[in-house]
């Protein structure tokens, strides 16, 4: 049952990114990023990385929601465009969904997929095993995982927030 839940969460995760890439209005872009952040952290928490999922979600909401709040405030429209109002946007959205379905069928057909990384152990990178010592709780080990195995997540998140703020400042400054 949990495999199906993770599969459904993964599909929602990718569909939300396809929805973000074909967003017609900044309001919907921020909405689907919040949904994708919550679903992604749910996937991490399903594999046992509760603290890492919580930290990523808090960093995500703390940083990116502020950036998209400013974006929405600067580019607000009285009648925002939706996905079905433009045939090009709807076509890009449907093409992205078709590509996702083809990728899912390819992954389900083969046992091990090695596109960029090898995906044999799905959640192994999100779990920091404590071993046989029962003196440590999962939350303490989650903090250790955030700064050891999850250091690249913190670096990428910080860099993404910096780039996002600089892009928003450049767009809103205008000429």
Swiss-Prot record:
<dbReference type="InterPro" id="IPR050269">
    <property type="entry name" value="ComplexI_Subunit6"/>
</dbReference>
<dbReference type="GO" id="GO:0045271">
    <property type="term" value="C:respiratory chain complex I"/>
</dbReference>
<comment type="similarity">
    <text>Belongs to the complex I subunit 6 family.</text>
</comment>
<dbReference type="GO" id="GO:0006120">
    <property type="term" value="P:mitochondrial electron transport, NADH to ubiquinone"/>
</dbReference>
<keyword id="KW-0830">Ubiquinone</keyword>
<feature type="transmembrane region" description="Helical">
    <location>
        <begin position="88"/>
        <end position="108"/>
    </location>
</feature>
<feature type="transmembrane region" description="Helical">
    <location>
        <begin position="149"/>
        <end position="169"/>
    </location>
</feature>
<dbReference type="Pfam" id="PF00499">
    <property type="entry name" value="Oxidored_q3"/>
</dbReference>
<feature type="transmembrane region" description="Helical">
    <location>
        <begin position="47"/>
        <end position="67"/>
    </location>
</feature>
<dbReference type="GO" id="GO:0008137">
    <property type="term" value="F:NADH dehydrogenase (ubiquinone) activity"/>
</dbReference>
<comment type="subunit">
    <text>Core subunit of respiratory chain NADH dehydrogenase (Complex I) which is composed of 45 different subunits.</text>
</comment>
<keyword id="KW-0813">Transport</keyword>
<dbReference type="InterPro" id="IPR042106">
    <property type="entry name" value="Nuo/plastoQ_OxRdtase_6_NuoJ"/>
</dbReference>
<feature type="transmembrane region" description="Helical">
    <location>
        <begin position="25"/>
        <end position="45"/>
    </location>
</feature>
<feature type="transmembrane region" description="Helical">
    <location>
        <begin position="1"/>
        <end position="21"/>
    </location>
</feature>
<keyword id="KW-1278">Translocase</keyword>
<dbReference type="GO" id="GO:0032981">
    <property type="term" value="P:mitochondrial respiratory chain complex I assembly"/>
</dbReference>
<keyword id="KW-0520">NAD</keyword>
<keyword id="KW-0999">Mitochondrion inner membrane</keyword>
<keyword id="KW-0679">Respiratory chain</keyword>
<keyword id="KW-0496">Mitochondrion</keyword>
<dbReference type="InterPro" id="IPR001457">
    <property type="entry name" value="NADH_UbQ/plastoQ_OxRdtase_su6"/>
</dbReference>
<comment type="function">
    <text>Core subunit of the mitochondrial membrane respiratory chain NADH dehydrogenase (Complex I) which catalyzes electron transfer from NADH through the respiratory chain, using ubiquinone as an electron acceptor. Essential for the catalytic activity and assembly of complex I.</text>
</comment>
<dbReference type="GO" id="GO:0005739">
    <property type="term" value="C:mitochondrion"/>
</dbReference>
<keyword id="KW-0249">Electron transport</keyword>
<keyword id="KW-0812">Transmembrane</keyword>
<keyword id="KW-1133">Transmembrane helix</keyword>
<keyword id="KW-0472">Membrane</keyword>
<protein>
    <recommendedName>
        <fullName>NADH-ubiquinone oxidoreductase chain 6</fullName>
        <ecNumber>7.1.1.2</ecNumber>
    </recommendedName>
</protein>
<dbReference type="GO" id="GO:0005743">
    <property type="term" value="C:mitochondrial inner membrane"/>
</dbReference>
């Amino acid at each position: 049952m949990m495999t199906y839940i993770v599969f459904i969460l993964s599909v929602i995760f990718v569909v939300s990114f396809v929805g973000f890439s074909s967003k017609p209005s900044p309001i919907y872009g921020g909405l689907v990023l919040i949904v994708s952040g919550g679903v992604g952290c749910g996937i991490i928490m399903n594999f046992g990385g509760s603290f890492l999922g919580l930290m990523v979600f808090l960093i995500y909401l703390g940083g990116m929601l502020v950036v998209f709040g400013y974006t929405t405030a600067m580019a607000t429209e009285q009648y925002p465009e939706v996905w079905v109002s433009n045939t090009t946007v709807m076509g890009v959205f449907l093409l992205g969904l078709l590509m996702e379905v083809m990728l899912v069928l390819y992954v389900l057909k083969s046992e091990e997929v090695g596109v960029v990384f090898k995906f044999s152990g799905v959640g192994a990178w999100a779990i920091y095993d404590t071993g046989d010592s029962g003196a440590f709780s999962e939350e303490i080990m989650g903090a250790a995982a955030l700064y050891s195995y999850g250091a690249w997540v913190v670096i990428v998140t910080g860099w993404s927030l910096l780039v996002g703020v600089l892009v928003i400042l450049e767009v809103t400054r205008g000429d």
